[in-house]
């Protein structure tokens, strides 16, 4: 079973677990969230081990503004990422979203089993730049790019959705800007307001400080 199918099963299991623990009552009160769904928020990221692992590995990774191109092959990807981020750091926020989305979407889609011999592996941006990856890896690379550009944590979410057309799990990045929720999606060439997307049902979302579970 690939990640795209496993992601929905994980969310269902998580919902049952949270309900059994009463977390829905302890977490932030549910309100209307992404794609019109009701959302519940919590802050125990240890329940999202793959994402927590990415954050841990990121703390051990050189920041993109290290322009060295020596050592392992990934270092040159770091230098290229550095140059790209520096080229857009003074642009307005919408222009940054467009540039980051375009830059990362140029990489080919590659399943985890091809890259890593595993059905589910969450890459750091440096791993993505070196090997490319699947939908969640595009979203993570975009998330971290914007964080390095100075975007606050609370303006970004990595969102796992159910694609109602393909009947598969999918992952996107959502940015909150000027009262809008903008999707950065490797399956959609241009930025798009989530209000204009009707074939995604949100399942869960994470950033560095919180998780959200959605109910339609």
Q: Residue locations for each model-derived region?
A:
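A structural boundary/capping signal
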Residues: 2, 22-216
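Bacterial N-terminal signal peptides
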Residues: 11-20
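Bacterial N-terminal signal peptides that target proteins for export
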Residues: 1-12
């Amino acid at each position: 079973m690939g990640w795209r199918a496993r992601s929905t099963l994980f969310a269902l299991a998580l919902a049952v677990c949270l309900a059994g623990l009463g977390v829905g009552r302890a977490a932030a009160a549910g309100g209307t969230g992404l794609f019109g769904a009701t959302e519940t928020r919590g802050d125990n990221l240890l329940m999202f081990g793959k994402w927590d692992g990415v954050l841990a590995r990121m703390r051990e990774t050189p920041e993109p503004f290290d322009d060295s191109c020596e050592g392992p092959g990934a270092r040159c990807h770091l230098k290229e990422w550095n140059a790209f981020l520096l080229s857009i750091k003074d642009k307005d926020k919408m222009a940054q979203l467009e540039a980051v989305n375009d830059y990362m979407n140029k990489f080919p889609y590659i399943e985890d089993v091809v890259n890593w011999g595993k059905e589910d592996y969450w890459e750091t941006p440096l791993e993505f730049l070196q090997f490319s990856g699947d939908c969640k890896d595009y979203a993570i690379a975009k998330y971290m790019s914007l964080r390095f550009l100075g975007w606050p944590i609370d303006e970004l979410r990595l969102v796992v959705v159910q694609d109602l057309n393909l009947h598969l799990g999918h992952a996107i990045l959502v940015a909150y800007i000027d009262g809008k929720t903008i999707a950065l999606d490797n399956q959609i060439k241009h930025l798009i307001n989530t209000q204009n997307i009707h074939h995604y049902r949100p399942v869960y979302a994470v950033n560095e400080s919180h998780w959200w579970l959605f109910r339609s």
